[in-house]
From Swiss-Prot:
<keyword id="KW-0346">Stress response</keyword>
<keyword id="KW-1277">Toxin-antitoxin system</keyword>
<dbReference type="GO" id="GO:0005886">
    <property type="term" value="C:plasma membrane"/>
</dbReference>
<comment type="similarity">
    <text>Belongs to the AapA toxin family.</text>
</comment>
<dbReference type="GO" id="GO:0008289">
    <property type="term" value="F:lipid binding"/>
</dbReference>
<dbReference type="GO" id="GO:0008360">
    <property type="term" value="P:regulation of cell shape"/>
</dbReference>
<keyword id="KW-0997">Cell inner membrane</keyword>
<comment type="function">
    <text>May be involved in response to oxidative stress. Toxic component of a type I toxin-antitoxin (TA) system. When overexpression is induced in situ in the absence of its cognate antisense RNA antitoxin IsoA1 it leads to cell growth arrest and cell death without lysis. Neutralized by IsoA1 RNA which forms an extensive duplex with the mRNA. Binds artificial prokaryotic and eukaryotic lipid membranes, with 30-fold higher affinity for prokaryotic membranes. Molecular dynamics suggests the peptide penetrates the membrane leading to lipid reorganization and thinning of the bilayer.</text>
</comment>
<keyword id="KW-0133">Cell shape</keyword>
<protein>
    <recommendedName>
        <fullName>Toxic protein AapA1</fullName>
    </recommendedName>
</protein>
<keyword id="KW-0446">Lipid-binding</keyword>
<keyword id="KW-1003">Cell membrane</keyword>
<keyword id="KW-0472">Membrane</keyword>
Length: 30
C-alpha cells in the first residue's frame, strides 16, 4: 500500500510539473 501511495503522489507531482511547463510555454509563445 505504501508503494501505491508513493506512485500516486509521484504521478500527481508529474502532472503538476507538466501543467506548469505548458503554462510557461504558452507565456513564452505570447
Amino acid at each position: 500500500m505504501a508503494t501505491k501511495h508513493g506512485k500516486n503522489s509521484w504521478k500527481t507531482l508529474y502532472l503538476k510539473i507538466s501543467f506548469l511547463g505548458c503554462k510557461v510555454v504558452v507565456l513564452l509563445k505570447r
